[in-house]
UniProtKB/Swiss-Prot annotation:
This is Ribonuclease 3. InterPro entries: dsRBD_dom (IPR014720), RNase_III (IPR011907), RNase_III_dom (IPR000999), RNase_III_sf (IPR036389). It is found in: Cytoplasm. Residues 7-135 form the RNase III domain. It comes from Chlamydia trachomatis serovar L2b (strain UCH-1/proctitis). The lineage of its organism: Bacteria, Pseudomonadati, Chlamydiota, Chlamydiia, Chlamydiales. Transmembrane segments: none annotated. Mg(2+) binds at E48, N121, E124.
Length: 231
């Protein structure tokens, strides 16, 4: 049995009225629902793609204006923390949008991780629909109030050891760390990376992991543990 959509209730939560409600219905339609009800003309995946870009732009603009002295690296990492799946899941929860998701019966039995993904995609798809219907301004008016305040955003910059190391070396030595990645294999033969972090040409730390990004974090963490007395 197909479900009906309470468009007015969703518009009230978004504080936005759609000129083309079909866009909203598409944004709510999970691919699993379309598989069960082929009469659903389109699912939300294309709108998710668009909404992801809209979210990234609005958050980037917000951080750029909020922190005029912040460098590109810290801006990038902070943005990542505000646009990832967990963050989008929280935005969906704040707006109570999850109850409107049109999703297949099988998908409803997924794990919590599956729910996070579905709700995150829903938020992005709705942003895509809002953008197509009304432009960037209403999308911005939805996104920005959901973001943490300035004081709450600041700690996000220091969660990543790479950011903490960069801040430490800039403050104490006025230089940036550099990373060198080498191929590496774990004991079971799985490929990965051996990353070394250098400061002023000196080796400060090393990290070994399956992904380059994780190996860089481990190298930065080791560097901090041996050079920053506060850690």
């Amino acid at each position: 049995m197909q479900h009906t959509v309470d468009i007015q209730a969703i518009e009230s939560k978004l504080n936005f009225t759609f000129s083309h409600p079909r866009l909203l219905i598409t944004a709510l339609t999970h691919s699993s629902y379309r598989n069960e009800f082929p009469s659903a003309e389109e699912d939300s995946e294309r709108l998710e793609f668009l909404g992801d870009a809209v979210l990234g732009l609005v958050v980037t603009e917000h951080l750029f204006l909020l922190f005029p002295a912040l460098n590109e690296g810290l801006l990038s990492t902070t943005r990542a923390a505000l646009v990832n799946a967990e963050a989008c899941f929280e935005y969906t929860q704040k707006l109570s949008l999850g109850e409107h998701l049109l999703i297949g019966r099988g998908e409803k039995m997924q794990s919590h991780r599956g729910k996070i993904s579905a709700y995150a995609n829903l938020f992005e798809a709705i942003l895509g629909a809002v953008y197509l219907d009304g432009g960037l301004s209403p999308a911005r008016q939805i996104i920005v109030p959901l973001l943490p305040d300035k004081e709450s955003i600041l700690p996000l910059m220091l969660v990543n050891p790479k950011n903490r190391l960069q801040q430490f070396t800039q403050q104490t030595l006025k230089v940036l760390p550099s990373y060198k990645a080498l191929p590496w294999k774990s004991e079971d033969g799985s490929p990965g990376y051996h990353v070394q972090v250098f400061v002023n040409g000196d080796l400060w730390g090393e990290g070994f992991a399956g992904s380059k990004k994780e190996a860089e974090k481990l190298a930065a963490k080791q560097a901090l543990s041996t050079h920053d007395n506060k850690n």
